[in-house]
Amino acid sequence: MALLQKTRKINAMLQNAAGKPVNFKEMAETLRDVIDSNIFVVSRRGKLLGFSINQQIENDRMKKMLEERQFPEDYTKSLFNIPETSSNLDINSEYTAFPVENRDLFQAGLTTVVPIIGGGERLGTLILSRLQEKFEDDDLILAEYGATVVGMEILREKAEEIEEEARSKAVVQMAISSLSYSELEAIEHIFEELDGNEGLLVASKIADRVGITRSVIVNALRKLESAGVIESRSLGMKGTYIKVLNNKFLMELEKLKSH
């Protein structure tokens, strides 16, 4: 397969993934196919975001690492010493992707390390390994292009997380601001009583203890439920089961109480 065709294969993966959640496993598989090597996509903290094996390495420690999807902390930190692509590192390199305890089996093993950079910061590392065949210029072009694509996807995922956080917070703030003073007071007492994300509430008991009507509690819960912040379910004489759906709610409530 020519370089242009291989590049187009990476592009096709990008186009097919448009708008869908990031799938680093598929990315690793595509890079494995076009570069013909083992591929490991490693986050800043050593989490294995995706990997694909072209040539099996029989080693218990490696198997455990892949199962746990976590690279050793020391190795991950050392990768940050590589600011640009470092190719064809042998088994004696501290950056080798081969198990050094089986050095004799992997004498010809070669590793290439490509930093994943996006938005001016180091987001992770793309690691490629082969049992013997040297990584040529075309392989390195594809690896660096692949690392750029992975970096773009990591940034997109981060942006989506930030957006989701902001949306959750805004929904909670709107829901809380829709409550009257007495409803807000009722909600504060309810969640003091629950002491967590979910639990059983007997509205009449809280109403009697705090000195508010039961209807205030019911209205307050309805407002939060219609905003999608909580869900509630009547269990008859036992009371009402309440569960927090928006993880920003209790934090915002705590902030209000501390002011």
UniProtKB/Swiss-Prot annotation:
This is Global transcriptional regulator CodY. The keyword Repressor applies. The modification Phosphoserine is found at residue 215. It comes from Bacillus licheniformis (strain ATCC 14580 / DSM 13 / JCM 2505 / CCUG 7422 / NBRC 12200 / NCIMB 9375 / NCTC 10341 / NRRL NRS-1264 / Gibson 46). Keywords: Cytoplasm, DNA-binding, Phosphoprotein, Repressor, Transcription, Transcription regulation. The gene is codY. Its main location: cytoplasm. SUPFAM superfamilies: Winged helix' DNA-binding domain. Belongs to the CodY family. The keyword Isomerase does not apply. GO terms for molecular function: DNA binding; DNA-binding transcription factor activity; GTP binding. InterPro entries: CodY, GAF-like_dom_sf, GTP_trans_reg_CodY_C, Transc_reg_CodY_N, WH-like_DNA-bd_sf, WH_DNA-bd_sf. Residues 1-155 are annotated as: GAF domain. Residues 203-222 bind DNA. It holds the Pfam family CodY. One of its GO terms (biological process) is negative regulation of DNA-templated transcription.
